[in-house]
Each structure stands twice: as C-alpha cells, then as structure tokens.
C-alpha cells in the first residue's frame, strides 16, 4: 500500500514537472485597489429552539442575555425561573464586502461561546453586527445550518463534523453602507497580492502602454501609483474596469514549501539545484517484548512467582542509494532522481532541507 501511495505522489510531482509556459493573468487577479476590501463584523446573540443541546445552568451569561431580551419585549420574569438548555449564547461574525448596499444580504457564521453541545436546528435571534468603529452595519437573524450531528448515551456517543458552529446563509441584511473610496479621487493605488519588483514593473508598463501616456508609476515592489487621465476624470469606475482587464505575466521567486505536519511538499517551477549527490537509506528498528513467568519449585516456602521481562531488538538498515543531481537541474530532474531512491514525501522534506543546508538549493525554503 505504501508503495502504491508513493508512486501516486511522485506521479503527481512528475505531472507538475512537465514543461510549462508562463501564462499572462489579469491585473484584477494579482492586485487590488487601495481601500477596496472587506470589513469584518461581529456581534453577540442567542440561538433558540435547540433540542436540549443548549448551554447548561452553569453558564450564567446566556440566562442574563435571555432575561434582557425578554425585558426589552415587555416581559418580566424571575431569573431563577429560567433554564437555558434550549438556548445557546453565540458569537456572530460576517464579512462586509466593498460597495455593499443597504438591503444586501450577507452570510454569517455562528459559533457557540458557552458549553452547548449542538446548534443544529436552532434559530439565531436578531443580532446587531458591528464594525471596528462600534457602528452597526448589519443585522442578522435566521435558521442555523450546521451539517452535523451529535448523539450519545451513557457509555458511547457519535458526532459528525462540528456541531457547535454553523452558518446562516443570507442571514444578515446590510443597514449601513461603507463610504465609496473611489469617488472623487484623482489618484489610485494598486496593491499587489505578492510584492515583486519585476511584476510591479511589468504592471506599470502594461498600463502605460494601454493609455499611451504615463499613468502608472512605481513607488515600491508592492504597489503601483495611478494618476487618472483627464479623459476618465469623474469616470473612475470606467477607468478601473479598463485597467483590471489588462493582462500581465507575473514573476515569482523560486520557492520550496514544506509542511512537516502533513508531509506536503510544493516545489515552484523556477527552482534550480546545483550539482549535488544525495544518498538515502532507511533504518528499521524492531522491538518485541515477550514477558515470561518465573515460578518457584513445588512446595517451596521461600520462592514467589515473578514476571521476568524478555526483550528482543533487531535493527535492519537498507542499503543506501546514491543519486547525483547535475547543476541547473529543474523540478522534473529532482523528482525523477529522488523517485529512483524510493523516498516518501516525508523523506523528501528532510532531503530538501539537507540540500538547502549544503548550499545547492537555489531557492527559498519555507517550512510551514
């Protein structure tokens, strides 16, 4: 099974290693205009209608929240008479997209903050959602979808997915609009998602070539300053639409990304390796415990029965193979050579780190 998995993994690497041509992409896919971004919203609310899976009586703040809600509706009740097994206190979060208009709907995330067991089947009561400036920008309410369940008895339980968090699709309505950051501006700034000197220079060149004048200028590798032409003054939306459709070929750094927790390796197309020899061998340690019982002779008055440990250890080391990677080897050469050694993805992580330590990996090595 491990052999089949190893072959599948390295077959995928070989497919990635096939010769590829750098593709031009739209500016809108690699950059964003300054100020055009999402804003985070948050609120505190109650989910009701739970089938006994709400917060326990030991969690005090849901009871107080429910009392306050009922009092605002003109219902007076003694706090000691309330149990909240069908109610759960939750934090509600949402992302307010740029240019969202009053009345637009947003998806919201609902997460339990108490000790409730499940939010499945519950209904989120009206919850104001505030921004970082403490202003209310949306109000959320609706049925909670969890796509999960949790059932149990005294001796066993079963759970699917995460029942204490869910979504309310389209559950929030925008009540306050964000200011239009593009209106009335004579200059804009384009921020690259991945700052790079070469990519920024190419973006500026493509824009200037489009408008046949100096519209874009470089300030740093992460941004391009734009002066709106006279023909587009008061027509910022048209200017942005014409600009973001332009195509440019981005440049990327040679990079190898390793995730030691999952054994994932991602190798960029531009990675090159200097001449280096790689040897890889496997060490297998086999330990077996075989305890034995030692008993005294029959009718003995002084002896006692004891358990005597017996341990056997066997160490086997596979014969290491040697692969030579020539100078300028690309990702395809690397994968083919290491595949010949029979390495696993986790072995490849250690090999890449060793090649980098030897000074032969001409790329950035990023461990996440």
From Swiss-Prot:
One of its GO terms (biological process) is bacterial-type flagellum-dependent cell motility. Belongs to the FlgI family. InterPro entries: Flag_FlgI. The lineage of its organism: Bacteria, Pseudomonadati, Thermodesulfobacteriota, Desulfuromonadia, Geobacterales. This is Flagellar P-ring protein. Transmembrane segments: none annotated. One of its GO terms (molecular function) is structural molecule activity. One of its GO terms (cellular component) is bacterial-type flagellum basal body, distal rod, P ring. The basal body constitutes a major portion of the flagellar organelle and consists of four rings (L,P,S, and M) mounted on a central rod. The keyword Signal applies. It comes from the Bacteria. It comes from Geotalea uraniireducens (strain Rf4). Keywords: Bacterial flagellum, Periplasm, Signal. It holds the Pfam family FlgI. It is found in: Periplasm; Bacterial flagellum basal body. The keyword Phosphoprotein does not apply. Assembles around the rod to form the L-ring and probably protects the motor/basal body from shearing forces during rotation. Residues 1-24 form the signal peptide.
């Amino acid at each position: 099974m491990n052999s089949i998995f190893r072959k599948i993994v390295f077959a995928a690497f070989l497919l990635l290693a096939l010769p590829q041509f750098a593709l031009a992409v739209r500016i809108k896919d690699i950059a964003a205009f300054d100020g055009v971004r999402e804003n985070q919203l948050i609120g505190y609310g109650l989910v009701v209608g739970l089938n006994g899976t709400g917060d326990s009586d030991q969690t005090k703040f849901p009871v107080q929240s429910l009392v306050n809600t009922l009092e605002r509706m003109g219902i007076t009740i003694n706090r000691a008479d309330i149990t909240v097994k069908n109610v759960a206190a939750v934090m509600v979060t949402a992302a307010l997209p740029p240019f969202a208009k009053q009345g637009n709907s947003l998806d919201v995330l609902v997460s339990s903050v108490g000790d409730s067991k499940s939010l499945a089947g519950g209904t989120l009561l009206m919850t104001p959602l505030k921004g970082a400036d403490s202003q209310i920008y949306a109000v959320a309410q609706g049925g909670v979808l969890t796509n999960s369940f949790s059932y149990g008895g005294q001796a066993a339980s079963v759970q699917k997915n995460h029942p204490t968090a869910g979504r309310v699709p389209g559950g929030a309505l925008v009540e306050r609009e964000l200011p239009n950051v593009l209106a009335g501006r004579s200059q804009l700034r384009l921020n690259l998602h991945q700052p790079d000197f070469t990519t920024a220079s190419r973006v500026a060149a493509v824009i200037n070539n489009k408008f046949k004048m100096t519209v874009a200028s470089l300030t740093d590798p992460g941004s391009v300053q734009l002066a709106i032409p006279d023909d587009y003054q008061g027509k910022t939306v048209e200017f942005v639409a014409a600009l973001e459709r332009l195509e440019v070929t981005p440049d990327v750094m040679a990079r190898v990304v390793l995730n030691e927790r999952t054994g994932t390796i991602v190798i960029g197309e531009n990675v090159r390796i200097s001449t280096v020899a790689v040897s890889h061998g496997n060490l297998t340690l086999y330990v077996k415990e075989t305890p034995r019982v030692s008993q005294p002779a029959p009718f003995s008055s002084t002896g006692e029965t004891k358990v005597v440990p017996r341990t056997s250890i066997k160490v086997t080391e596979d014969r290491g193979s040697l692969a030579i990677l020539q100078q300028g080897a690309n990702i395809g050469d690397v994968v083919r050579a290491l595949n010949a050694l029979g390495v696993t993805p986790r072995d490849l992580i250690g090999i890449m780190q060793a090649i980098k330590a030897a000074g032969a990996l001409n790329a950035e090595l990023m461990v996440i």
